[in-house]
Amino acid sequence: MAELTISADDIQSAIEEYVGSFTSDTSREEVGTVVDAGDGIAHVEGLPSVMTQELLEFPGGVLGVALNLDEHSVGAVILGDFEKIEEGQQVKRTGEVLSVPVGDAFLGRVVNPLGQPIDGQGDIETDIRRALEIQAPSVVQRQSVKEPLQTGIKAIDAMTPIGRGQRQLIIGDRKTGKTAVCVDTILNQRQNWESGDEKKQVRCVYVAIGQKGTTIASVRRALEEGGAMDYTTIVAAPASDSAGFKWLAPYTGSAIAQHWMYDGKHVLIVFDDLSKQAEAYRAISLLLRRPPGREAYPGDVFYLHSRLLERCAKLSDELGGGSMTGLPIIETKANDISAYIPTNVISITDGQCFLESDLFNQGVRPAINVGVSVSRVGGAAQIKAMKEVAGSLRLDLSQFRELEAFAAFASDLDATSKAQLDRGARLVELLKQPQYQPMPVEEQVVSIFLGTGGHLDSVPVEDVRRFETELLDHMRASEDKILAGIRDTQKLSDEAAEELEKVINNFKKGFAATGGASVVPDEHVEALDEEELEKESVKVKKPAPEKKAKKEQK
């Protein structure tokens, strides 16, 4: 039997090797316990060092956000499936505040409020992350809004223009075309995107909050068919999602957009709609036992929207000159814009487009109420050509609405009032526009020129849109240099205006109204001058009846 020999050197080297490769698996974690959970909210005890807005990890990898920091417990909003969270489960701190991945890889994708793809097209590969709660640009970091963001909608670009970096509220009752206005605006950016010029290109973010899944799918389909998904990201928090997701979705969209803005690019973000975000935040606050205020909303509901919308800005040239334009949507009830949330958002934004259900039902689409709608940026966000032709449009339409109400009760109207009514009816018809058919700005200028210049006064109201469509088709085919001149110079010179009038007058000669009648106005006969009037007049002296009777008696 072989003798067992033990070498002290071998034992020593083995121990040294083991000690050198030893790593401690112990770690220090702050762990809390779920006290109660339900309706997407959990109260946790035992996390004394937790930060506000810090991410917490629940069993199964479910995340939560610490909102209420009470003396003995933490109130957290659960992001995801909260049905499996029970009393007594352990909760860990992550030491991180909520952030989302950002970057160009998000273009063309549909994501949830955590930045995770939900469109079935694979993972989104990006190394850049951005915190959701981030300070808005300061006054020094901004510059005034001066570049137009064309929506492609005549009524908006002519009367309530939107500039890059502006916040323009779209407000109205349900089913009045609010989403359609925003989708049209996204579709209208396609030409700029295809130009390849980064100064013209506008990336778009559409945030769907509390919408039906079918509605979000139809918006995505419309964007795909219009070739707009190449430069658009959709952040979806449908009605089936928890209140926490609906509350966070706008901040996620804003973080994705801000990344591009600080990179010197231009972004358009649509919040559809902030009424549902406010309702979700109200539900969260009431469940967390926060004191309710007006309409049961918490006291900081104004701050909820102001800190979101203040991120929209036109950055200074030192920071790259990027911009983020916001189109928040608010749903009213019975056209009441004096309710709590509508007045809050009106006071935060730089103007509003009010869509009225009565106008919508009358067939005026987009159903923009000119009297209540306003843009506080105004002419600074318009090209010179549009500013020239649309200067009197708002006043003409406002006077028409007043006269229309008066004419309903009065039978006798003077010629001036009748002329105003006739022109106003044609302007209303001219501003109607089909859904998902945005119009280039140079064609809008020609269209508005037709109305404000009185060139449609001889065209029957029912033929106004056909006249406009056929004239623009004719100009694209044979008079494209006028359109190209407006597009390139962004001005309508006197020579171009005269040439445009000639084209319109020549086109009128070949245009026939529905009944076959000509739309060329009758030749205007000028009144005689005073000198000619004296030459033509014949003076006849007749004696007075009394004197004539006395002569007969004599």
Curated annotation (Swiss-Prot):
It catalyses: ATP + H2O + 4 H(+)(in) = ADP + phosphate + 5 H(+)(out). It is a peripheral membrane protein. Its EC number is 7.1.2.2. ATP binds at residues 172-179. It is found in: Cell membrane. It is an enzyme of class 7 (translocase). GO terms for molecular function: ADP binding; ATP binding; proton-transporting ATP synthase activity, rotational mechanism. It comes from the Bacteria. The keyword Translocase applies. The keyword RNA-binding does not apply. Keywords: ATP synthesis, ATP-binding, Cell membrane, CF(1), Hydrogen ion transport, Ion transport, Membrane, Nucleotide-binding, Translocase, Transport. InterPro entries: ATP_synth_asu-like_sf, ATP_synth_asu_C, ATP_synth_asu_C_sf, ATP_synth_F1_a_nt-bd_dom, ATP_synth_F1_asu, ATPase_a/bsu_AS, ATPase_F1/V1/A1_a/bsu_N, ATPase_F1/V1/A1_a/bsu_N_sf. The record marks 373 as: Required for activity. Residues 528-554 are annotated as: Disordered. Its main location: membrane. GO terms for cellular component: plasma membrane; proton-transporting ATP synthase complex. Residues 535-554 have a biased composition (Basic and acidic residues). F-type ATPases have 2 components, CF(1) - the catalytic core - and CF(0) - the membrane proton channel. CF(1) has five subunits: alpha(3), beta(3), gamma(1), delta(1), epsilon(1). CF(0) has three main subunits: a(1), b(2) and c(9-12). The alpha and beta chains form an alternating ring which encloses part of the gamma chain. CF(1) is attached to CF(0) by a central stalk formed by the gamma and epsilon chains, while a peripheral stalk is formed by the delta and b chains. Belongs to the ATPase alpha/beta chains family. This is ATP synthase subunit alpha. It comes from Mycolicibacterium paratuberculosis (strain ATCC BAA-968 / K-10) (Mycobacterium paratuberculosis).
